[in-house]
């Protein structure tokens, strides 16, 4: 009788199976932000600010790329300024105007 009960007993796992996890990854940073500082000289085509959306708006002599990157249209000096309470913009002042 005792032998019959033991033969019907099942061995159950006492550790969970090694399933996959949901959160086991992380993407690399996108290297966004300022690439040139206020007062720094830049050449035409230089990237000034890399961003997603328009955190900083383009001002005089600054263009905006398809990915919202701000870049210099002419040689000059970078000038960051505030537009009202919430907006910021960056301009490039030609070298003769910056002094």
Swiss-Prot record:
InterPro entries: Ribosomal_bL27, Ribosomal_bL27_CS. It holds the Pfam family Ribosomal_L27. Transmembrane segments: none annotated. Coiled coil: none annotated. Residues 13-65 are annotated as: Disordered. It comes from the Bacteria. Keywords: Ribonucleoprotein, Ribosomal protein. One of its GO terms (molecular function) is structural constituent of ribosome. GO terms for cellular component: cytosolic large ribosomal subunit. One of its GO terms (biological process) is translation. NCBIfam families: L27. Belongs to the bacterial ribosomal protein bL27 family. This is Large ribosomal subunit protein bL27.
